[in-house]
Curated annotation (Swiss-Prot):
Keywords, comma-separated and alphabetical: Collagen, Cuticle, Disulfide bond, Repeat
Subunit structure: Collagen polypeptide chains are complexed within the cuticle by disulfide bonds and other types of covalent cross-links.
Compositionally biased intervals (Low complexity): 207-231
Its job: Nematode cuticles are composed largely of collagen-like proteins. The cuticle functions both as an exoskeleton and as a barrier to protect the worm from its environment.
Protein name: Putative cuticle collagen 75
Amino acid sequence: MRASPLLSLSIFITFVSIFSLLTYLPSFFAQISRIERQLEEELDEFLNIEHEFRKEFDIYPKNYERRQKKHVYSYCECEYINTCPPGRIGITGPDGQPGKDGLPGMPGSPGIPGELPNILYQQVFGCRICPYGPKGKSGYKGIDGPPGIPGWPGEPGVRGMNGERGSTGLDGAPGEPGSPGLPGFAGLPGSIGITGIKGVMGEVGEPGAPGIPGEEGLSGPTGQPGSPGSIGAMGYEGAYGDRGEPGPPGPIGRRGGPGLDSHYCPCPSRKMFLSILREKTKKQL
């Protein structure tokens, strides 16, 4: 019971952190593009300054006559340690135009402890190390190299947000009918229903043909006296049939409850009308 709140809290914190990370990515990429733009501007400014300096440097005439012709030998005449006195100071050039203020640079990361190469510890005999000359022109574009080795597969990306709910698809074709289920258990017996309203008295039907007298039945036990029925409407006088032999009175059964079709009133049968007519004729006689 205690693990459920902690689990829900951890899931909520995870979702919040992922959402904050996704919202920070646009500003992060915007900051990177801004830094690249600043670096490009500073590099263009530096190239412009270099171009102007080279133009001003080319204005002054080159005095080749003052140079003494050096003797060219098959070996280098310079020494590793130069003890020659420095030359006189040249003419001071004109002041350059003040440059534009540069953009503030990003703070650099602390460097690692440096190590002096082993080459500098070695004693060099022969020519001294001269400074590098001016930067040469860019060379021609070389031939495209062969394709590199395929890199390692990258790490899986962050899972994207859930997309919007799609529209409801079309109804599929109806499936095949399933196999018939097992027969259900028998239901509990229903409660006794409410006695229905007495229906409208139907029309008197045509008198039926006299029936064949039945065999004399066994004498049944004396039944309990039934409740008197309601007096029905006077019917049309029918033809007198042959009087049959009186049979022994049968037992009166108890009244049964309504069946399954208790709300459906079937039409009265012809035998019911004949029994009502016979009772009325007996009472009149």
